[in-house]
Amino acid sequence: MKEKFNEKVIPVILKFINTKGIQSIKNGMVTSMSPLIIGSIFLILSNFPVKAVVDVLESTGIKPVLDQVCGATFSISALIAVIGISYSYAKLENQEPLNCGIISLATFLILMPSSITTEGGEVVSGIINKTWTAGQGMIGAIIVGLIVPPIYCWFLKKNIRIKMPAGVPEGVTNAFSALIPAFVILTGAAVIHGICSIGFDTTGIEIIYKVVQTPLQKMTDSLGGAVLMCFTGPFLWFFGVHGSTVVGGIMTGLLQANSLANQAIIDSGVELTIANGGHIVTQQFYDQFINITGAGITIGLVMYMFFFAKSKQLKALGKLGIIPAIFGINEPVLFGAPVVMNPMLAIPFIGMPVIACLIQYFALYTGICPLYGATQIPWTCPPIISGFLLAGWKSALLQLVILCVSFFVYLPFIKKIDKMNLVQEKNQPVEDEDEDW
């Protein structure tokens, strides 16, 4: 069974995750992390958990300054995504990437609404509606970022470009080379916008949001969708495939869209609850609770090896893996224990993230713990601290519960392995140190 899976399924999965599209999404979405993390720092400061501090920030006029940074970083996440994905795709094709990113950005702006209606019914035109440059435009940004670059690269590969004489600066040459593909792409975007606007009184990005993004977000936010996501990552890891890359490449756009939708509810002054449209499954749901201490939540495994292991091999591995695990890095354990391709650890490794998913989903669904806004904590931030920074002491306590559960889930399996290793070590003949003298 295992051999057939490795021969038939693994090559297909590897081929999928190595496609230019998936690689572009993975690399492109990472570009949004820096501004989102910086924005999250300002968001934490602006909504400091001590009321006296918030009062001082408001009275001194500092809070609006902090909020300005939050709005600027969170509100352009879709724009960053479309540029990042397009840039990454063109780079993989060995074509000039910056022009590709700019053309994709222009395409995205053409396809999105350029007006808003005020509460009084007045239509204000000629604006960039930040509703669509953040979470609601995320899937549209991904789609544009996957469609524009292949067209752009096709023109350049076929040498359909304006050629400049030798000696012209490279930047000027690249700009003129992009003119023909840019004209074709932006004209096509204008035609699509005209059809949507004149024929259906809407825009391309709005159609994508209603037809594609909303159903996908609902599916992702369901318990079944969450369990499937949490199962897939460690399942692939078990067979040596980087499951986090696969899940991240497919799910990051949707998870970030859910996070930004939650933040929009907070910014509107409404309480962030499920009843008010809040989402349970967000980027933080996955990063800070399902992938805590690494894929498979292996901290329980490492804690046993560090404190209780009797065999020399596991003791040494525990010492090697404890510090990296605290910062979310568990490759030493995955390949050292090993967890990968080890049938004795398959059940806890694949099952623990699913258990954590069920615990967290229940805590958020029932309101025991608060839903998450757009605050992004680096995945390398140690547990408990990351939970507190994310949503206060309740989230920190939830992380602690998951860490404790991890220990008991792994315990019977690693004890058995430890006992087997100990017997094997005792049965190994001791080499005579003076043998070679």
Where are each of the predicted segments found?
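Core transmembrane alpha-helical segments of multi-pass membrane transporters/permeases
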Residues: 20, 24-46, 139-142, 146-147, ...
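Transmembrane alpha-helical segments and their short flanking loops
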Residues: 2-16, 55-63, 121-122, 263, ...
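Alpha-helical transmembrane segments in multi-pass membrane proteins
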Residues: 78, 82, 86, 103, ...
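Inter-helical loop and helix-membrane interface segments of multi-pass membrane transporters/permeases
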Residues: 46-69, 106-136, 165-170, 199-218, ...
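Early transmembrane hairpin of solute transport permeases
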Residues: 14, 18-162, 340, 360
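Central hydrophobic cores of alpha-helical transmembrane segments
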Residues: 99-108, 240, 248-253, 349-355, ...
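Generic multipass alpha-helical transmembrane bundles of integral membrane proteins
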Residues: 184-308
